[in-house]
Swiss-Prot record:
Function: Participates in the translocation of lipoproteins from the inner membrane to the outer membrane. Only forms a complex with a lipoprotein if the residue after the N-terminal Cys is not an aspartate (The Asp acts as a targeting signal to indicate that the lipoprotein should stay in the inner membrane).
Gene Ontology process terms (BP): lipoprotein localization to outer membrane; lipoprotein transport
Subunit structure, interactors included: Monomer.
UniProt gene name: lolA
Statement: the UniProt record of this protein carries the keyword Zinc: no
This protein's name: Outer-membrane lipoprotein carrier protein
Amino acid sequence: MHRQLRYAVLATALFASTAFAAARQELDTFTRGLKGLDGQFSQRVTDANGKVKENSSGRVALATPRQFRWEYAKPYRQLIVADGKKVWVFDPDLEQVTVRAQGSEEQNSPLVALINPALLDKKYDVSEEAAPRDGLQWLSLTPKVDTDASFQMASLGFGKDGLAKMEVVDAVGQRTTISFSGWKRNPAFAADTFRYTPAQGVDVVGDAH
């Protein structure tokens, strides 16, 4: 191997290792002692050709072990609540809520790495992007073959305030990019943050019991 080529290979390997260490360190620092998160998000969905299908924004809350709340405010309201046993999807405009058992689909979400980082290497093949992108250090997660995941690949981008961005590519090439801001660590959640009780007049679809 030529000296220049050998140097290039070694330099690339060293840089990639450093980038991975930096990104993994960002994850470890962000998740240390983490029991819950509350923040704002903006989301963009594009098809396999890069055409924008939807822009949305709202609030997200996560808590160990399996609770989450996605509260979409724009362009239309929608509420998704997981209480650890069931997932409720409420559409105010339709006055309808759909409820189903909470299963592996949620447990295999990339965000599981935040509130249960011990599952990261168990569920995913973890790699790094060799150089920062958008000013962030990135970890790429590819579901292992025996993992019942609903996506092909996901990436977590970390900045000075922790997780700043998440990208998810599904089976048909659709890409969802979520930017996070205003994270509050281990907040005192209201008692009903991860509970949903249908109001009178709301049509319930599914098994609520």
